[in-house]
Amino acid sequence: MKKRKWATLSAVVGTAVLLLSACGPGDDNSSGSQPASTGTKTLLVWEDVKKADGIQDAVKEFEKQHDVKIKVVEKAYADQIEALRLDGAAGTGPDVITMPHDQIGSAVTEGLLQEIKPDQKVIDSFTDESIQSQTVNGKLYGLPKSVETTVLFYNKDLVKKAPTTLDGWYDLSKKLTKDGKYGFVAKWDEIYYAQSVLGGSGGYIFKQKSDGSYDVNDIGLNNDGAIEGGEYIQKFFSEGLFPKGIIGEQGINVLNSLFTEKKAAALISGPWSFGPYKEAGIDYGVTELPTLPNGKHMSSFLGVKSYNVSSYSKNKELAEKFVEFITNEKNSKKRFEVTEEIPPVKKLMKDPIITENANANAVSKQTKYATLTPNNPEMAEVWKPIDSALRLIATGRTDVKKAFDDAVKQIDSQIKANHSK
């Protein structure tokens, strides 16, 4: 998952240390797997920023059950692998981390993650897609923490009944766009969001094989479906239905401001926006993404956050037990109640706590039309070229086919240069 998506909604918080054990204020030992003075084992767990409260009770229970002291440190989850590269080798890294699944392929290639081998009953408790996200070359490297995908937000004060088709939103936008105000807006100059149109039209990143792996020689970002989707995207920009200010890396801030200032009636975002939009005083509704002109549902990327064991851990077996414990049904439910991160636990996906929560239910429905963001190392070569192509399309500086053809050539060239065996 692209890291910059997360830094835009709130100020970046410095590393916050939350001690959920006997580590006192004067304890400056930040390394994992170090024995305490009493001989009790310790685990260092890196949790996402502002999410430690969701595991506090589970941590205390695990400490009692296993006579272990656990230290929880909050770090931005998309940055933890980068920190592990340095801290792990230095002997000060964590035993357990949380991370986006599309970083797993590279992390495994670098030898940063430990394979885990939970009972099949544990594996079967999660949705198939979420387990697939943690699997590389047939081996499991983590257990799912939560799933997320993009959904449609609309301002109830500006839209009484949300259209269910993208053409319907196009028509509404034609009526509402004037005097610096807009109807529906989306960050379609980035593949993370544009995939909703390209994927629903038949485009794809890499062709997926029957075993779940990806054929990096089959890139579908310039096929007929992708080109059709790109032309549809270009229409919203060329007709002025999307403001130019949303184009570029800082455009997400403009997009969010339009919605929170009631200058946009609707937009595409994800679960990370539930809190900020509520805090901004917006009375919003949430629904799965609308259907495309071809009658198919808009697609989206399915992202999975996970708990993973560091290969540098000196207590790998205990760390794996903690990962299993923290992701079980009971603790996943408690974590959802605190953080609203949706756990891909099969039983919970049918639980009223999810189905009767409007926000969570919208995400759950959209996951049916979502595809996993590829977790293979070659995915790292995709983001910049295709985003550059989409920005050329958004600004009208080139036609769709040429932009996508050039992007695919660059992606293919970079894969051959950086990932050839």
Residue ranges of model-derived segments:
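Glycine-centered hinge/linker elements that transmit conformational signals in sensory
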Residues: 173, 215-247
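Hinge/lid segment of periplasmic solute-binding proteins
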Residues: 101-151, 161, 166-173, 197, ...
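Long, aromatic- and glycine/proline-rich binding clefts that accommodate carbohydrate-like moieties
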Residues: 287, 336-392, 416-420
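Conserved N-terminal structural module of periplasmic/extracytoplasmic solute-binding proteins
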Residues: 2-20, 24-105, 293-295, 317-318, ...
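Short, solvent-exposed loop/beta-turn-alpha elements that line the ligand-binding surface or hinge
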Residues: 118-126, 204-228, 279, 291-300, ...
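Extracytoplasmic "Venus flytrap"/periplasmic binding protein-like
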Residues: 61-126, 135, 141, 157-160, ...
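Extracytoplasmic/periplasmic substrate-recognition and gating elements
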Residues: 60, 64-65, 69, 278-338
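A structural signal for short loop-to-beta-strand junctions that line the ligand-binding cleft
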Residues: 87, 94-95, 123-156, 182-187, ...
